[in-house]
Structure formats: C-alpha cells, structure tokens
Design a protein with these regions (language model features):
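Short, small/polar-rich motifs associated with maturation and membrane association
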Residues: 1-279, 293, 689-690, 742
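Short aromatic-centered micro-motifs
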Residues: 102, 487, 741, 772
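Outer-membrane beta-barrel proteins
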Residues: 107-150, 170-174, 214-234, 253-294, ...
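Conserved small-residue
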Residues: 158-211, 309-310, 662-760
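Extracytoplasmic gating/loop element in the C-terminal half of outer-membrane beta-barrel translocons
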Residues: 196, 321, 325-330, 347, ...
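Extracellular/periplasmic, surface-exposed regions of secreted and cell-surface proteins
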Residues: 282-291, 297-301, 306-311, 316-319, ...
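C-terminal extracellular loops and terminal segments
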Residues: 639-649, 688-706, 755-771, 798-814, ...
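Glycine-rich, aromatic-lined ligand/substrate-binding cores of catalytic
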Residues: 759-792
Length: 917
C-alpha cells in the first residue's frame, strides 16, 4: 500500500491541529529569562509534564512524538540504552549537523540522563527573538527542559510503579533452508554458473534427512525471544516553607532484552540488560529577603550488559546467515560454521564472552540571586555556576569461540568435520571508556520595572562554557555577552530586542567572535477596546527577525596538519628517505554559519476552550562549511579543504490547536500539531554537471538521486532490440530497465534524477491527540505521522539477497522476476551483484510516510471519597498503556523509521499505578 500520509494528515487535522501552547502562562527563554506567554513575541512551543507523562520511556525524547509544533522527533533503535530519538527543529537547515541545543535548567546536558517524572516542561525555541540569545550555538534551535521544583505547601509524596514489556516490530522473514538452496541455484544459473546444490542435496534440505549437514535453522527464532520486559519505580517528595522549598526524586528502572540463550555461561549473562538510577534534589533557599539561592544536584548511575559481540555484529549475522548454512552446533558439540560463514549468530550471543559498561554522572549547579532594589528599584543580579562530570567504565570477559564445519559424505564416503577455529581462554579486561567534564559560569543583571502604562525588562549577561573530553583535540569553549530587552505598552504593544556577542574556540584566533542581533514585535488586538469580548480571550499578532549562528565543528580545522610521508628517492643512485608531508590543509578563513531568521505568527484563544497558534517562517543560512573540491581545481594535488561557501534557504509553517470542554462530569480534549519544513540548497560548491537535472543545487539536503525504472527486461530479444543501451554492467533478462533522461541512447551516470524526497527528516510532520474522562475513568490517545519522506530500501538479504553470501527474504523470493514468474516486481536473483539492479533507483526508493498510534492510555483515578478512610493517601491512579501499537504505511515489512540492519523497534505495553500522599 503506497500512498502519502499527507492526505491523512490534512483530513485529520481539519477539526484539530496540535496541542495548545498559549494556554501555559510562563514561557522559558533560558538565560534566566522568562515572560508571560501572552506578552511574548517568541515563536516558542511547550509540552507540559502532564502531556509527556503518558509515556514513561527510558529516554524522555521518546515521550515527545507529535507533541510540539516545529519539533520533529524520529525513532531510532529499540534496545534500552540506545533508545533515544533524533530531534530536529523546523527540519534540516544545514548540510552539517542540525542537532538542536539541549538545555536542562539552563545548562547544556543530555536529555537521556533525565527521567520523564522529573520534567516540568519542555519548551522549543524556534525563532530569532529567542535564539539570538544563544549566539553562535542558536541556529539549529533550542530545546529547553525545566525540571520540577518545590513550593510552599505541606510535603507531598508521590510513588509510582510500572511494569512494562515489549515485543519486536516487523521482524524480517527469511526463507527456509530448502528455499534458500533453490534460490542460490537459480541465482547461479542466472549468472551463467553451475548450480551449487544437486537434486539429492535439495531433497535433503526439503526432507531434513541429514539436518546436521543440510540444516534448516530459524536463526531469528533461536537467537531472539518474543519479548523484553522491565520495571520503573519512582519516588518523589516536594514541599517547603517560606525559607526553603524542595523537590527530591529517586527513580530506578531496568530492562531485560530479547536475546536467547544467554544464561548457559559460567557466572555471567550475555543478555541485553540495562539499569539506571537517578537521584535528584532541587532546593530553593531564601537566605534573606533580598538573597535567594537555587541548588540542583542530579546523580545518574547506569549499567548495561551485552555479549562481547556487539549488537551490529549479532544482527549483521542474523541478516546474513542462511537457514541452511550450518547447524547451531555439530554432533561433536562444537559451534557450527563454514569457511564462508564464521559468524554463527548463537555463538556470537552465547560464546564470545560479555561486556559490561557502568556510567557515573554528576550534574551540579547553583544560582544566587541578589535583589538590588535598594540601589535601583527593579534591579537584581544573578550568578550561575554549573559543573558536570561523567565517566563510563567497561569490564568484560572475551574469548574466541571454536567452530566447525560438517560435510556429508555421499556414496559411502565418510562425513567430514573440520575445525575452523580453536576456542581461546577467557581474557578479563577493564578500561576507562569515557571521562568528560563540563563547566559553565554566567553572571547577569536584570532590570524589571513598571511605570504608568509602561513595562520594561532588561538583561545584561556574560556566559562561559568549557567542555573537556577524553583524548586529544577534544576541548571546546564558548563565550557570550548578551543584552536583551522586553518592553510592553498598555499591555498590548510589545517590543523585544537582543544583541549578543558570541565566540567559539573551534574558530581561528582573531576570528572567533560574531554579533547576533534580533528584534521582535507584538500586538495584542484583544486588548483593544474595539475588539474586546468575553468570548475572545486572546488575539495576538507577532513577528521577529534576527541572526543566530552555528559553529559546532571539529577542533583545529583552521590549522595545517603534518604526518609521516612515504619514502622519496634522491640523487643519481636512488636512496630512500622518509619524511613529513602535509596531511590536511587548513580551512582558510574558517567562520561560523549565519542563520537569518524571519518569523510571523498569530495566537488565538477563545471561549476559554479553544487555542490556536500559527507560525510562518523563512531561514536564510549562509557560510555553511561545504566541500571545496567544486571550487578548486583537481590539479591541487591533495585533499581539498572545506570552505564556508554553502547557502541553504528553509521555509515552512507550524500550526497548533486545542479544544477542551466538559459536559457535567464528562470532560474531553482534542488537539494536535502540524509542521511543514522545506529547505533548498542555493550554493554548495557543486562540481560541474552537464545537465540541470543532475544538479543537487536547487534540491533539499539529503535529496535522493538515482535511475528512473521503466520496467524489467523480459527476454534477451527485448534487450537486443531496445535502441537504448545500458552501460552499467552486462544486461540480462530480469534486470531493471532505466529511462534515458538525456536522449543519448545510453544509460550511464548522466541519467540519474531526483527521486522521492530526502531520507533525513520528513517535510511534513504532524500529531493529534484525543482524551476524555468521566468520574475518574478516562483515556488518552496520541497519534503521530510524517509525509514527504523517503527511504532507500537496501537492507542486505531483505532487498539485496544472495550477493556477498547473504540469505534471501521471503518477500524477495515471492516477488522476484524469474522465467516462471515474469510478472515479478523485483529483479532477477544473482550471486554476483548487478549495477543494473542493486544501485539507487526508483524501485528501491520507497514512500516512507506513516501514521503511528504512539500512545494509548486507559486509566482510573479512584474517587476522593473512597480514600477518606485510607490514612495519608490523597490519590490513587491505576493505568494501562500501549506505545507504537500500530503503523499505517506503504513499506509493510519494515518500520519506516528503522530501515536497515539493526535491533528492531519495539511495541510496548505497560501496567502500573501512582500513589499520592
């Protein structure tokens, strides 16, 4: 089923478009700056703790699917400690990294270190009015996470427990041993070679008369169980008095993966195991009437366990080894193998030893705020200090497992067993994998004053960031000086302005600083006398323009590097001499990317039920670091350095809406969000291309190029009679037939055109949600989808069978072209590969649009009257949840977000309860 999800998106979003963002009263800019959202000119959007709490995922990024307009969240692998999503803000705006800046309580930190339960809100900053504050690090946007804090009230204790289990999504289906043998013979015949297996060997596969020599092993069934499971326990307490408020949390979670067998070793397991404990304390201390201190501490302790063979090795073997290659073990109790296949999947799991990684992370920060109103009314000063330290240690036993081939002796000959590899002794090893630290210091003065119909808030800030990583050339520093002002007149006319000077250590001395201005304006029409109405809660127009930067390059690109050179011969009698040579040419005039951002938006709230936000934007990105080979002659003689010549334009729209209402005891809510983000390469130093349709310039970043397929050659006669000749490789019946784009009667590299869309980030991204509750019984459902999104189907064995000794999927076997199946839609089988088939072409470029049910929660909150007789208990909630329950798409046999050789994504179920005391 191939159709674009954009039509589904448009249909579903007519009545409801995204979660309301303007209903929350305070918007966080970061930098110690926050304003009432009613009086903000910023294109910011926010998800609250209540919204993200419906999925207590191991990595909080997986709780953000489809929640925040302008934030694209794409799913990655499915195993516990690498389950984080990829985040983009307003799509891709550069040919380099588009990763946004992640801030936790104002400090750059990893979202994966947090738990869902400790997050108060997640705010996405998207336009220049907010991003100019971050100067040289703001161009890709900012995700600002605020953690929970205490308040003045009696202690409130929350305890929650969740049991979860998950099942793999869309595992590939590979053929049995008999079918594989048939496929291999067919492929070799198509290549003009003799068949690999005789008829009696085929019969042995089919009848399983000699399973040791002609096996039929379902490697996926033997290596993986059908579920993973885990626990999540959370305890928190908050409260405080006038002097001290506190929030403290203890969270523990674990997860056991899908490998089997994993317990047959002496004293250790090779299961995919993960556990993590978070301990957080947030304190607000009123030292005096004019002095306040905030102290935040977070300790994260994690451990993961796996076989010595890493996940890519295990799944690489599962995707490659045929069912009929060898038995799991021979009759001599030695792991099976052959000279071709030395990667027994089960031996990789159970026989290679184990590797355990332990992580220790400390996040500590403190801020001191001093009220200076005695000097000047409205004046205050704040100092912030943060220090992070994290290290990862590894230990493990490693060994080489023995394997053995088994060959059947026919016609009275003896069976042959050949030892391919001897088993080694265990070697125990420990090592420090990573040790990093991060120091941040900032000092700022704030002025907040109202007089008459005027309000002014101004900030002057200095900030310094320093990161020290393990190894050479792994130190980075940033420095910022920021001036910001926010002015409001008559509660309806708003002006924001900012000017920041920002520097990065990765740039050349003397060229490290940049200036980043911005201006924003807003008009609250609903405050005008001629528009005031009880039904119109808010109507605001706003616009902003400014510049933000990006300079997260590798260190020392501005330096020349020299290394040892090859020998050179001197004099009449050649004498070899070694020496030094230029290894890397410096980037001349290395500078930061400059993102010129324009945003226009409108916010609407009506009837105390409806909220709507619409933003349109344009981003002109210049000085992008790109390959310089298109601008410098190839006679240069060595690798051409990169240059800041790239230009990319991006534009789009973000829409968010929500409707909340009640009828008696029945409350309901419906909402969603829709984002469209497109980019266009204006300049990339592209090499000369003889035809316009070959040019990458003018297309989006990551646009797929390849051959356009017109069909499949059915016979040698058709090949001979066609006046267009394919010069990619020898053409045989069953090969793909490509379109001649330039009319020169030949198919070569000049016949590639743009196919589909990019495979990095979808242009259309949307989500919608619906929820209802009646007397404590309720449900919430979150859907998320994407469109204008393509993927290249090139997974080995699934779409690239037999070549390089791969197995073959049932899908390919059923749909291949053959003499007996001329209507097959996939190319002929081959063991040698073919540039006519296994290249990038329209047959392998799939529409990756999808719609997923990300979360479905059903819950019951016990009535308060039931709890009156239970001492100290103020609330009980019981729930059941499902995540990624179904996906509507056109690929069917694979998750459109996870194409390739990897751990499968997982469908998750959870049951639990929350207690409030």
């Amino acid at each position: 089923m191939k159709r674009s999800m954009k039509f589904i998106a448009a249909f579903l979003l007519l009545p409801c478009v995204a979660t309301a963002q303007v209903t929350d009263s305070i918007q966080q800019y970061g930098r110690g700056i926050s304003f009432d959202m009613k009086e903000s000119t910023v294109a910011g959007a926010m998800a609250t703790s209540e919204q993200i709490s419906h999925k207590t995922s191991i990595d909080p990024s997986n709780s953000l699917y489809g929640l925040i307009p302008g934030l694209q969240v794409l799913q990655n692998g499915g195993y516990a400690w690498d389950d984080g999503a990829t985040l983009y803000i307003r799509g891709v705006g550069t040919s380099n990294s588009s990763t946004p800046l992640i801030l936790v309580d104002g400090f750059e930190r990893e979202i994966s270190s947090l738990t869902v339960q400790e997050i108060e809100s997640v705010t996405v900053l998207k336009d220049a009015a907010s991003l100019a504050l971050y100067g040289i690090r703001g161009a890709n946007g900012v995700v600002y996470i605020k953690t929970k804090r205490g308040a003045v009230h009696a202690p409130v204790i929350n305890f929650g427990y969740e049991f979860n289990f998950s099942t793999p999504n869309r595992l590939p289906d590979f053929v049995d041993g008999y079918t594989y043998a048939q496929a291999l013979n067919e492929g070799m015949k198509n290549d003009g070679l003799s068949p690999r297996y005789s008829q009696r060997e085929l019969d042995a596969f089919r009848d399983q008369t000699y399973p040791e020599f002609y096996p039929n092993v379902d490697w996926w069934d033997e290596a993986l169980r059908d579920h993973a499971y885990g626990n999540n326990v959370n305890f928190s307490i908050s409260g405080g008095g006038e002097r001290v408020q506190y929030y403290a949390q203890l969270n523990y979670l674990n997860n056991l993966g899908i490998y089997q067998p994993t317990e047959e070793n002496d004293g250790y397991s090779t299961q995919l195991k993960y556990s993590k404990m978070n301990i957080r304390t947030n304190l607000d201390i009123k030292v005096s009437n004019t002095t306040k201190v905030k102290l935040n501490l977070l300790g994260v302790f994690s451990e993961n366990n796996r076989p010595q063979s890493d996940i890519s090795t295990v799944f690489g073997a599962l995707y490659q080894v045929p069912s009929g290659a060898f038995p799991i073990k021979t009759s001599q109790n030695i792991w099976g193998g052959t000279t071709v296949y030395s990667n027994n999947p089960i031996a990789n799991i159970a026989g290679s030893g184990y590797l355990r990684t332990q992580g220790r992370t400390l996040y500590a920060d403190m801020s001191i705020n001093q009220d200076l109103s005695s000097l000047l009314p409205g004046l205050s000063a704040t100092v912030n200090v943060g220090y992070d330290s994290y290290g990862f240690y590894q230990e493990g036993n490693v060994r080489t497992f023995a394997d053995q081939s088994a060959v059947k002796g026919w016609d009275g000959a003896e069976d042959t067993y050949t030892k391919l590899r001897e088993e080694s002794d265990y070697t125990f090893d420990t090592s420090l994998k990573t040790m990093n630290s991060h120091f941040n210091f900032s000092a700022q003065t704030n002025y907040d004053r109202s007089w008459g119909e005027h309000k002014l808030n101004a900030t002057l800030l200095y900030s310094m960031d320093k990161k020290i990583g393990q190894g050479q050339n792994n130190k980075y520093a940033f420095m910022d000086v920021v001036a910001q002002g926010h002015y409001t007149y008559k509660n309806r006319y708003i002006l924001d302005f900012a000017l920041s000077g920002s520097a990065s250590s990765v740039l050349e001395p003397g060229n490290r600083w940049g200036i980043f201005p911005s201006i924003g304006a807003g008009w609250i029409l609903s405050e005008e006398d001629w528009l005031k109405s009880d039904n119109l809660n808010l109507l605001k127009l706003r616009a902003s323009y400014g510049i933000a930067g990006r300079a997260d390059f590798d260190a020392n690109l501005y330096k020349y590097y020299f290394g040892s050179g090859n020998s050179y011969y001197f004099k009449d009698t050649p004498t070899s001499q070694s020496g030094m040579k230029e290894y890397r040419i410096a980037v001349d005039g290395l500078t930061y990317e400059k993102s010129h951002k324009l945003n226009v938006g409108v916010d609407l709230m009506a009837w105390n039920k409806l909220s709507l936000t619409v933003d349109g934007y344009y981003d002109h990105r210049t000085d992008i670091l790109v390959d310089g080979s298109g601008a410098i002659s190839s006679v240069f003689g060595m690798t051409v350095p990169m240059r800041n010549d790239g230009i990319i334009n991006s534009y789009g729209v973000d829409v968010a809406a929500n409707w909340t209402d009640h009828i008696g005891d029945f409350t309901y809510q419906i909402g969603g969000q829709f984002s469209f983000a497109r980019n266009e390469i204006i300049e990339m130093n592209e090499e000369y291309r003889p035809y316009d349709y070959l040019k990458r310039t003018g297309h989006s970043v990551g646009q797929i190029f390849g051959y356009e397929v017109e069909g499949i050659y059915q016979s040698q006669e058709e090949i001979d009679q066609r006046d267009v000749k394919q010069y990619l490789s020898d053409v045989r019946p069953g090969d793909l037939k490509f379109k001649d784009q330039n009319g020169d009667k030949r198919i070569d590299q000049y016949d590639q055109v743009a196919l589909g869309y990019n495979e990095t980030c979808p242009e259309i991204y949307y989500g919608f949600n619906v929820g209802a509750e009646y007397k404590g019984l309720g449900f919430t459902a979150y859907f998320q989808g994407a469109a204008n999104y393509s993927k290249i189907l090139d997974t080995k064995s699934v779409y690239r069978p037999l070549v390089s000794n791969n197995t073959i999927s049932q899908y390919y076997w059923d749909n291949r072209w053959s003499e007996s199946n001329p209507n097959g839609t996939l190319p002929r089988l081959t063991t040698q590969g073919s540039d006519n088939n296994y290249n990038t072409n329209s047959s392998w470029v799939a529409d990756a649009s999808f719609l997923k049910l990300r979360t479905l929660e059903v819950y019951y909150q016990l009535p308060e009257k039931w709890l009156k007789n239970i001492a100290f208990v103020k609330g009980i909630k019981i729930f059941g949840r499902g995540h990624d329950l179904f996906c509507v798409d056109g690929i069917d046999i694979a998750d459109p977000e996870s194409i390739g050789v990897a751990h499968p994504t997982m469908r998750q179920y959870a049951f639990g309860f929350n207690l409030k005391f």
